């Protein structure tokens, strides 16, 4: 980060919004498995199920952070810049800019690398499917641009912001897949994008159903719907990696 590279002003609210809401979703999915045991007292899960609800309302106030990130959309999708690759940083160095960031205004002027370039380096089926979904979202923004009323409609912006958040996360995941290539297998990456494709389709359907969506917008939302590529072998290999971590962590009270 620097005065000429302020991309972090998108990534920070994105993390606050998306990580906190996904934390809730993880707890909900675990609760479906744990069922009644999730109500037992004096367990970690009983505490987690209660406290996880606070994060999206406190640290990651969702509607506030989505209102922030949508300001970046025009430049992100249609006005890219060129920045040098950022390597993995694990060195001991004083990050002077952290304490001298300056004002946070001018969010709409911040530019980003062309996200499409990083997608070109991967050939996993679900990565390609997700790239197709993004292309339709770009068409949505260019040809069925939300009107002035929709841009003030928080409910509409929440749905659109969710789609944008998935695109940014996908770009960051792929960039880091290159940096941590020894730790991230092609199977794992494809399985991650299996989730992203489904989440994007869910978000597109939500946007389709908004009361203010137009016929043109609805048609484009339907074109965003995709089913991820099914690969039982890939799923099994990823499951074996996860299953091997069982009992690797023990909570100390």
Segments predicted by a language model, with ranges:
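Flavin-dependent oxidoreductase catalytic core characteristic
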Residues: 1-253
